[in-house]
Amino acid sequence: GFNLIATANNRDKGVNELSSALKRRFNTVILPVPATEEEEISIVSKRVSEMDRALELPAEPPAMHEVRRVVQIFRELRNGQTEDGKTKLKSPTGTMSTAEAISVLNSGMALAAHFGDGVLHARDVAASLVGAVVKDPVQDDLVWREYLETVVKERSDWKDLYRACREVD
């Protein structure tokens, strides 16, 4: 026998639903998005650290502020509003899942380790971040640019991320 583990998300329904025969043969588990930002940050930082060790990346563990920023961006875009609730946002067509946040940071860590100074910087995160948000080159690009100009640009401690993301465009 063998085990098969696969993942999907609720927003990617595809053309056809899973057939009744397959539903009987597979155990499906639906995991909700983490309830709090702190819970999501904890999951992301733990998984990124595990992956970095497994890949034996010669980079330092990501600074918590980079993890926090990526998670905050994902949560704000996913929820359609800023953390403080003052600004309504358009949401991209992608899922903006916790798994994608982990992927963005893992990619940034690999870039920092092999092409940078071994420390995760905004420039290492920017390319993967833009790629995670912009799935549809028309609709999502507008959502991303609006978020970049109205939210990221206005946060004084995010100037480096704003510049790095603008350079990717």
Language-model region placement:
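Context-gated lysine
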Residues: 13, 23, 46, 86-90, ...
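C-terminal engagement/docking regions of AAA+ P-loop ATPases
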Residues: 113-169
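Canonical AAA+ ATPase core
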Residues: 1-56, 109-111
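Generic hydrophobic/packing signal
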Residues: 6-7, 21-24, 74, 95-96, ...
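Generic structural signal for short, flexible, solvent-exposed coil/loop and linker residues
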Residues: 4-7, 11, 15-20, 59, ...
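Conserved AAA+ ATPase small/helical "lid" subdomain
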Residues: 41, 48-124
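Residues that form generic nucleotide/phosphate-binding pockets
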Residues: 25, 43, 47, 69, ...
